[in-house]
Amino acid sequence: MIQTKYRIHFFIASLLHFFIFIPFIVQKFIGPDWDSYALLGTVMNLYEDSLYLPSRPPGFPLYEFFLTFIYGLSNYLNLNFETLFLISQFIFVLGNNFIILNFFQKQSSQRIFLYYIIVFSPIYLTSGLSVIDYHAGLFFGLLALYL
């Protein structure tokens, strides 16, 4: 668990990410990356036709099946699937923020500015605002290293 002195950094980073995230969720913009649209095509094929065509070689079936479940849930609940995809992406970003901060706490690091450099780097932000598997993969990779 994060100590109190580190907790504020998690909340600051997460709150700033949330404010950056708001326009994307309002516009239901799944991202500038073409891989996001390929992933969406895979999800729709899998859900509607029960046909798995990888979004890109070699395919990322775990994340594609996860999004297919969310797509089905959105149809069942009559919700917009882009919104649910983006919310799930944001949850992975928050999880990554939490685990990265735990690495700094585990090392008793006083260089917390490095945490902010990591979580506000352009590639971290861009991939966090696109419906793509980068943050999901990062989450499970960091979790494996942390545990």
Language-model regions, residue ranges each:
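Hydrophobic core segments of transmembrane alpha-helices in multi-pass, intramembrane catalytic enzymes
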Residues: 39, 63, 93-97, 118, ...
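Short helix- or helix-capping micro-motifs
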Residues: 17, 114-122
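Short hydrophobic/aromatic helix or loop-helix immediately within or flanking a transmembrane segment
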Residues: 42, 53-78, 87-90
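Transmembrane signal-anchor helices characteristic of membrane glycosylation enzymes that use polyprenol
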Residues: 5-36, 46-48
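Membrane-proximal lumenal/periplasmic loop motifs of glycosylation machinery
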Residues: 24-32, 47-68, 82
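Short acidic/glycine- and proline-prone juxtamembrane loop motifs at membrane-interface regions
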Residues: 34, 56-57, 126-136
